[in-house]
UniProtKB/Swiss-Prot annotation:
Family: Belongs to the crooked-neck family.
Pfam families with a match to the protein in the record: HAT_Syf1_CNRKL1_N
The protein's name: Pre-mRNA-splicing factor CLF1
GO CC, any one term: post-mRNA release spliceosomal complex
Protein keywords: mRNA processing, mRNA splicing, Nucleus, Repeat, Spliceosome
Gene: CLF1
Protein role: Involved in pre-mRNA splicing and cell cycle progression. Required for the spliceosome assembly and initiation of the DNA replication.
Cellular compartment(s): Nucleus
Record organism: Kluyveromyces lactis (strain ATCC 8585 / CBS 2359 / DSM 70799 / NBRC 1267 / NRRL Y-1140 / WM37) (Yeast)
HAT repeats: 43-75, 77-109, 111-143, 145-176, 178-209, 211-251, 253-285, 295-327, 332-364, 374-410, 412-443, 445-477, 518-550, 584-622
Length: 684
């Protein structure tokens, strides 16, 4: 019944608090000692003092214990004893700030102002870098209305050159007292101790509030002179003071003063983007649009020149500088390029990014000379100067040699172009130059020169498979099959040293060449080499088999030759040659497939054997009949499960079961195998 009443009762915060309070553990109250007379009081005080002294004997460095001891004596109104304890504690560690603060607060609490003043004087003398003690001293004196003493304390404190907070506090005090001349004197010392931009700007704000235009301008001038005289002043501080100075002058309508200030500043610090941006914004707001762009561009040009004088290897700046000169100072562009070539020569003896960027700008200069100046002797001289700078024994730039040769070709000076390319190959052969020279001679149909160049190219880099293939293709296009065949043979010899992968590429092209030349027997021989070189790759077996169905038989060749003799051409004047797959082609293809199947069967490579059978099946689907297709389909392997015992553990595995292998077994073995499988099935 009681439970139901509780469930129906509303739960309130009051009920929750009462329940929590009732479950709260009761803490046993400490024994209270009632002191009835003076005798008992003195006895209790003696015992407490003994306890404190005993604890301090064990650990006299526990300053918090000293403070509790002294506070106890103050609570007992025994000021003499409390002072004695504080003094003893200060002898232990006079640098403990909370001890000084409690000592001073205790004296102030008992209105012992002179004693508190003496303590503050002692504390600030002993610890002049502790701002808290100074502020407490100042608070005490200012609350008593002793402005003269406060000013003296501030003066003494600032003689120690404290942080900005002390100076700001002194300035606020004098401002409250309306002693503005004293504030100016303080600022004059403040900026010497803390010559940062923030200090100067505080002084400026003060003069803007309590001074006149002349005083503000004087402070700005002093600030700018002082900050620029220090070599370690950050540029951002100088930018701030100049920006503030110029903005203030503009606000007073002194636009020429502001403009002159920006101009001198940009000339003095040309690398300052902030000053340039401020100057641009000023001109947009107060200047004329006619001269603003020219002023900005001139300043930017001077900035680039100053920067490149200090760092001539900054090629990105050179590029931008040349862009600017080309756009606005066209008459100075040639001298700018010449300065670049002379001043920005890379020092590195390796072909790094600095050389590439240097040559890129040189190429730009050469293009400019040819398209604009068109002074041929000057262009040749510049080409020669640039080529003389490059250490060709270490590296070279094929693009530059090719440009020089193309320039001479455009001047119809083919002999000079060949000489340039020859010098390039003699000093530092480059594949790019070889290819360009070869293509040039091919276009000129100077094939004897092309052959010599290919021989030099292969001699320079015999491991380049592409050079061998291009050389062979050249001879093939020229109709010299023997030369082409010889190049293929030499490239595959051991003396050349091509890698296996490159030899596979060569022999593949070699087969295509012999096929195009109708040398099918040679192509078959190459396929045999191809198989050996590829370690009897299954795909090459398949390709060889299919190859037999893509070439004509002897009968077809004879028919083609007779047709050729009879002059049987189509409408376009080309020879007709109709090719059909004959039973002979199919026979050769199937024979190679069977050879591949036997090879992989002999070497127990079931996966590859299956792949060959699958390819044979696809072939029969296209070129076979129903009978051959069914035979090949019947030879396809199936996946069977078998049990294998490994380390006395019977495991299941899967293998490919080829019908050809079953057919090859004798009848008795087949019967036994069938009976064993039937018994295994019945047992399971």
């Amino acid at each position: 019944m009681g439970d139901n009443s509780l469930s129906n009762e509303a739960i309130t915060a009051d009920n929750i608090l009462k329940d929590a309070f009732s479950q709260k553990k009761q803490i046993a109250a400490t024994t209270k000692a009632d002191i009835l007379d003076l005798e008992e009081l003195k006895d209790w005080q003696r015992r407490k003092r003994t306890e404190y002294e005993t604890v301090l004997k064990r650990n006299r460095l526990d300053l918090r214990q000293w403070m509790r001891y002294a506070q106890f004596e103050f609570d007992q109104k025994d000021i003499r004893r409390a002072r004695s304890i504080y003094e003893r504690a200060l002898l232990v560690d006079h640098g403990f700030i909370p001890l000084w603060i409690q000592y001073i607060d205790s004296e102030i609490k008992w209105k012992n102002i002179n004693h508190a003043r003496n303590l503050l004087d002692r504390a600030t003398n002993a610890l002049p870098r502790v701002d808290k003690l100074w502020f407490k001293y100042l608070l005490l004196e200012e609350s008593l209305g002793n402005q003269g003493i406060v000013r003296g304390i501030y003066t003494r404190w600032c003689s120690f050159e404290p942080g900005p907070d002390a100076w700001d506090s002194f300035i606020e005090f004098e401002t409250r007292c309306l002693n503005f001349e004293n504030v100016r004197n303080i600022y004059s010392k403040f900026v010497l101790v803390h010559p940062q931009i923030d200090t100067w700007l505080k002084w400026v704000r003060f003069e803007q509030t309590h001074g006149d235009i002349s005083s503000v301008r004087t402070v700005f001038s002093f600030a700018l002179d002082t900050l620029t005289s220090f070599s370690g002043t950050p540029l951002v501080d100088i930018e701030r003071v100049i920006g503030s100075f110029a903005s203030w002058e503009a606000s007073q309508g002194e636009y020429e003063r502001s403009r002159t200030l920006y101009r001198l500043a940009v000339e003095r610090w040309p690398i300052s983007e902030a000053l340039k941006e401020q100057q641009i914004q000023f001109e947009k707001k107060f200047g004329s649009s006619k001269n603003m762009e020219d002023i900005v561009i001139a300043k930017r040009k001077a900035e680039y020149e100053q920067y490149l004088k200090s760092d001539p290897y900054h090629y990105s700046t050179w590029w931008v500088y040349i862009d600017l000169v080309e756009e606005k100072y066209q008459e100075q562009l040639t001298s700018a390029f010449q300065s670049f070539i002379e001043l920005a020569k890379p020092k590195s003896l390796v072909k790094d990014s600095s050389w590439k960027r240097y040559i890129r700008i040189c190429v730009r200069y050469l293009v400019y000379l040819e398209l604009t100046i068109n002074d041929l002797p000057t262009i040749r001289s510049v080409y020669q100067d640039i080529l003389d700078i490059i250490p060709h024994k270490k590296f070279t730039f094929g693009k530059l040699w090719i440009m020089y040769a193309e320039f001479e070709i455009r001047q119809n000076n083919l002999l000079k172009a060949r000489k340039i390319l020859g010098v390039s190959l003699g000093k530092s052969p480059k594949p790019k130059v070889f290819k360009y020279y070869i293509n040039l001679e091919i276009r000129l149909k100077e094939f004897d020169r092309v052959r010599k160049l290919y021989e030099k190219y292969i001699d320079f880099n015999p491991s380049s498979v592409q050079s061998w293939l291009d050389y062979a293709e050249l001879e093939e296009n020229l109709g010299d099959e023997d030369r082409s065949r010889g190049i293929y043979d030499i490239s595959m010899s051991n003396n050349v040293g091509l890698s296996e992968s490159d030899q596979l590429i060569v022999i593949q092209r070699y087969i295509a060449f012999e096929t195009d030349a109708a040398e099918y027997e040679k192509a078959r021989e190459l396929y045999e080499k191809y198989l050996i070189l590829s370690r009897y790759d299954v795909n090459i077996w398949i390709n060889q088999a299919l190859f037999e169905s893509t070439i004509p038989t002897e009968t077809q060749l004879i028919a083609y030759q007779q047709s050729h003799q009879d002059g049987n051409f189509d409408d376009d004047g080309e020879e007709e040659f109709s090719f059909e797959i004959t039973p002979e082609n199919k026979h050769h293809t199937r024979a190679i497939f069977e050879k591949a199947i036997s090879y992989f069967k002999e070497h127990n490579e079931d996966k590859k054997r299956q792949q060959v059978l699958q390819s044979l099946l696809e072939y029969e689907k296209v070129h076979g009949n129903q009978e051959t297709l069914e035979k090949v389909n019947a030879r396809q392997p199936s996946l069977v499960r078998e049990k294998v015992t490994i380390d006395n553990i019977e495991q299941e595995s899967y293998k490919l079961d080829f019908p050809d292998d079953r057919v090859a077994q004798p009848p008795i073995a087949r019967n036994l195998l069938a009976l064993a499988k039937q018994w295994e099935k019945n047992s399971s």
